Design a protein with these regions (language model features):
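Periplasmic c-type cytochrome electron-transfer domains
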Residues: 2, 14-397
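Core hydrophobic alpha-helical transmembrane segments of single-pass membrane proteins
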Residues: 7-12
């Protein structure tokens, strides 16, 4: 069952502007409004001080990107769901980072500019070479995109907006469209505490998107409740998988380090080509020209990994989490084409750990305990452009 929201039509001379918008003065759940009016995340993890080690529970979190006002966050939410941000006015950020699909799209690789629809059913348009990354916990990210080319949420936001292959817009047209919209001029003035007479800037646009994305936090899974002391939160099978996951043989936590289940580093794991007969994706090596980073990709978070399938790896080469575990259980470089040379990661877990079938399946069971979508964003009822808002599943009551 889907909830359709924001069904406004195009006018004869342009977009019909929707009226009556106001930004929420409240911080999102799990955020607290401070005395200076900004929202700060509050989590049990902030009470922990241990930062060393890879497999332990009750580990401290790294610094997060927060400190935005409620109005800036809510403005970012409206922008995130507004197709006005794309060059053809067909796709919003949410069409590819959809709440129903783990803030990704459920496709093997993304469908870019000109595509229709959302999620796994998105069709047509530019065929993108990589999977759409999830946005869960990007507030903690120090590298963004599969190749790690962005270091801030603002930089990440501007990448797809102005890529001809993705959203196909330009900075000039985007700011022109926003400034021509009375409602957006009012909302930006609210969010940034300034006069409506001042023109909307690109920095304000990417800043608002960063504010919203900083609230996409997933830290309340059954694993988290177990880590905080509730030993009944996970099943015996999941606890077995956790112990294999963090144990000496598998050492998954060397890269997928709790509590974020990523270390945000670039890793060369010998990923197979995107498809049989195709050349490998050089990853970070293509932009750094460093031979040691040929085939390197950012270590993805495993939070909500069960929600972002069914395809995995940088180009959806693997079709299940069982296949992913089997990949790491095999010999180093086994999936690389003959003659392909890569500086493979040296960790012990890349040396064919020889996990039993039972232990491998237990790891997959444990990954299900990392599900938490309690802070999944809800779309606005309408957006200032008047364009249709992408449908989302009706929230269960």
């Amino acid at each position: 069952l889907y909830l359709l929201v924001g069904t406004f039509a195009l006018g004869a001379v342009g977009l019909a502007q929707a009226a009556g918008f106001n930004l929420s003065p409240q911080c999102p759940p799990s955020f607290e409004r401070t005395d200076v009016g900004v929202c700060r995340l509050r989590s049990m993890y902030q009470t922990y001080t241990r930062i060393e080690g890879h497999g332990g529970v009750q580990m401290a979190l790294p610094p997060a990107r927060d400190g935005f006002t409620p109005q800036q966050i809510d403005l970012g939410r409206h922008l995130f769901f507004d197709p006005l941000l794309s060059g053809d006015r067909k796709s919003s950020c949410a069409h590819c980072h959809h709440p129903d699909h783990g803030l990704a799209d459920g496709r093997a690789t993304g469908a870019g500019f000109g595509a229709e629809g959302f999620g796994p059913e998105r069709r047509g348009g530019v065929a993108l070479p990589r999977r759409t990354p999830t946005l869960w916990n990007v507030a903690y990210a120090t590298r963004l995109f599969w190749d790690g080319r962005a270091t801030t949420l603002e930089e990440q936001a501007s990448g797809p907006l102005f890529s001809p292959q993705e959203m196909g817009n330009s900075a000039e047209r985007l700011t022109q469209d926003l400034n021509a919209n009375t409602s957006y001029r009012q909302l930006f003035a609210q969010a940034f505490a300034r006069s409506e007479d001042k023109a909307i800037t690109l920095n304000e646009v990417t800043g608002a998107l960063a504010a919203f994305e900083s609230t996409l936090i997933s830290l309340n899974s059954r694993y988290d409740r177990y880590a905080h002391g509730d030993r009944k939160a996970m099943s015996a099978r999941e606890v077995q998988g956790m112990n294999v996951f963090r144990g000496f043989v598998a050492r998954c936590t060397q890269c997928h380090t709790p509590p974020l289940f990523t270390n945000h580093e670039l890793a060369v794991v010998g990923a197979p080509p995107p498809a049989k007969g195709q050349p490998i994706d050089e990853g970070a090596g293509a932009i750094t020209h460093d031979p040691l980073l040929r085939g390197a990709f950012k270590v993805p978070t495993l939070r909500n990994i069960t929600k972002t399938g069914p395809r995995y790896f940088n180009a959806g080469q693997l079709g299940s989490l069982d296949e992913v575990v089997a990949f790491y259980n095999a010999a180093r470089g086994h999936a690389l084409p003959k003659g392909e040379k890569q500086a493979l990661h040296w960790h012990v877990h890349m040396m064919k750990p020889k996990l039993s079938d039972d232990d491998a399946k237990a790891i997959v069971a444990f990954l299900g305990a990392l599900e938490d979508e309690t802070m999944s964003p809800q779309p606005p009822a309408a957006v200032p452009s008047g364009l249709p808002v992408v449908p989302v599943r009706a929230a269960p009551h």
